[in-house]
């Protein structure tokens, strides 16, 4: 017989909610929350489903569980050992399915923990809340970001937030994320002069022109990081040039690169230093910048302490706080002045074919969430 958390996780996994489609996941969650007295607010924005739910009074702190019902595409179905939306638990106790780790397992654990908490502590202090979206794995324009804008506009208080991203690496709770690096992308267009390869003196080869500047960008020491963040990194992901002909010097080159930056650098400082390097090499260039998110950090305090002590109480393990990895919706919530911690299952197979987690980990995660609720709001 499956636990309540595993039953719900399987029900959610069986709904093929590839971004931005929700496939009824939120309806299921909202119905469960309504049954234990949560006030619900649906926020469909463009083609994205979102909801905000809360239980408790207007006074006191607010602890929010945040997450997403959408999943990434499955990839080739024939590569899966078990169909990705079957939610199958094998003989080794592994739960298979797209979203098992990222992050329908977390959603189930959050919801079951919250149900239990409001029944056990009906007069709890403050509020328990949920912020759920179907657009985290995609563009993320009309999901958490847009909901946060509405919450800010009406001066909604949000003290603490647990995001259910799969933070663990080997054992559930061994790692929590107490921040994330910022992400700044750029598309650089470098203009040269097209010509014949036999007459280079009549052309300007943008590939040759960029090479020394690119070498300098790659070797640049952007910052040294700090106690919470590694040094800022610069990575080139795409270089495109050429006409397709072997005897033509191209007239243009496009390079795509990305900064993952710490709190030791700013968007403006990075932009300025890139411009300085390009100008030093007398290049004819243009950059389109795209900021995906600013770095954020939750330092030791009420939320991080409660999560860490709950992990210790349930598992006997000391957790480690980390800011490594990619961006998450926590970056939007942190703009509210909220303490944000990410805690979820083991992330070894996220976004992969044959995504799976140890099924019993979800029951452990439920207990950790429940203990955290008690420590903060009971």
From Swiss-Prot:
Keywords, in A-Z order: Amino-acid biosynthesis, Cobalt, Diaminopimelate biosynthesis, Hydrolase, Lysine biosynthesis, Metal-binding, Plasmid, Zinc
Binding site for Zn(2+) 2: 102, 137, 351
Cofactor note: Binds 2 Zn(2+) or Co(2+) ions per subunit.
Required co-factors: Zn(2+); Co(2+)
Keyword presence, RNA-binding: no
InterPro entries, alphabetized: ArgE/DapE_CS (IPR001261), Bact_exopeptidase_dim_dom (IPR036264), DapE_proteobac (IPR005941), Peptidase_M20 (IPR002933), Peptidase_M20_dimer (IPR011650), Peptidase_M20A (IPR050072)
Domain of life: Bacteria
Record pathway: Amino-acid biosynthesis; L-lysine biosynthesis via DAP pathway; LL-2,6-diaminopimelate from (S)-tetrahydrodipicolinate (succinylase route): step 3/3
The keyword Cytoplasm is assigned to this record: no
EC number(s) per entry: 3.5.1.18
Catalytic residues, chain numbering: 70, 136
SUPFAM superfamilies per UniProt: Bacterial exopeptidase dimerisation domain, Zn-dependent exopeptidases
UniProt-listed Gene3D superfamilies: Zn peptidases
UniProt: Zn(2+) 1 binding residues: 68, 102, 165
GO molecular function: acetylornithine deacetylase activity; cobalt ion binding; succinyl-diaminopimelate desuccinylase activity; zinc ion binding
Reactions that this protein is recorded to catalyse: N-succinyl-(2S,6S)-2,6-diaminopimelate + H2O = (2S,6S)-2,6-diaminopimelate + succinate
Gene Ontology biological process: diaminopimelate biosynthetic process; L-arginine biosynthetic process; lysine biosynthetic process via diaminopimelate
Family: Belongs to the peptidase M20A family. DapE subfamily.
UniProt function note: Catalyzes the hydrolysis of N-succinyl-L,L-diaminopimelic acid (SDAP), forming succinate and LL-2,6-diaminopimelate (DAP), an intermediate involved in the bacterial biosynthesis of lysine and meso-diaminopimelic acid, an essential component of bacterial cell walls.
Subunit structure and binding partners: Homodimer.
Protein name as catalogued: Succinyl-diaminopimelate desuccinylase
Organism: Pseudomonas syringae pv. syringae
